[in-house]
Amino acid sequence: MSARSSVRDGATVAALCACVAACSTTHKPEADPARLVPIMKAMDKNTPTPGGAPTCTPDQMIGGATMTQVTLLKISGEPANPGPEREDWINPAELDSPAARELIDPATDETTRRQAAYELLSAPFFLVYRIDNVDAPMALGIKDLKRGTVGSRVLRYDTQGDIVCVKVMNFQSSLAKSDWAILKSNLAVMDPKIAAELRTDLHEQMLKYVRALGRPEQP
């Protein structure tokens, strides 16, 4: 083989390798995040009254894009009403699909935002965790010595933002943590450290209930 032929063959191999490398780099599909805004606004508007929608079965709550009501409002650009129901500790980030988190993170670059928008728009349905009432005075720093209770619902919407079904999800502070807090609350005002412990406990109780959503109902 001549030197010229060897150089030519080497160049051909290098070009082929470059082509393979370029072709193997898949570009994730993108979509305009603005397309999500009317869907999110429709979902917020179509929040049903209690008893105003069918009850979701366990299998209806598996496979969609998930998010908290707070995240829904952030994506839609609508402000959240003030109150404990919209605070971060009871609207945990763990309940958001990664794509939803990326959309509301101010540090996300534009390409990633567009890829996240495409992913959400491709979801078969949306599952929204909505906190309706936080009756947990000790967790909120108020000295009212009773066990904390949170009323919430899991709302399934179709891809247009219309309600499909609802699952009521009410939960309480763990009895052990609640009793501990009552025993320790011997001051005139609520100890902020105890209140923080109770918020963490309610956060954990919520995640425990969420993990059980797709399981069959107990007889």
Predicted regions and their residues:
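Bacterial N-terminal signal peptides that target proteins for export
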Residues: 2-12
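C-terminal motif of bacterial Sec signal peptides marking the signal peptidase cleavage site
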Residues: 20-22
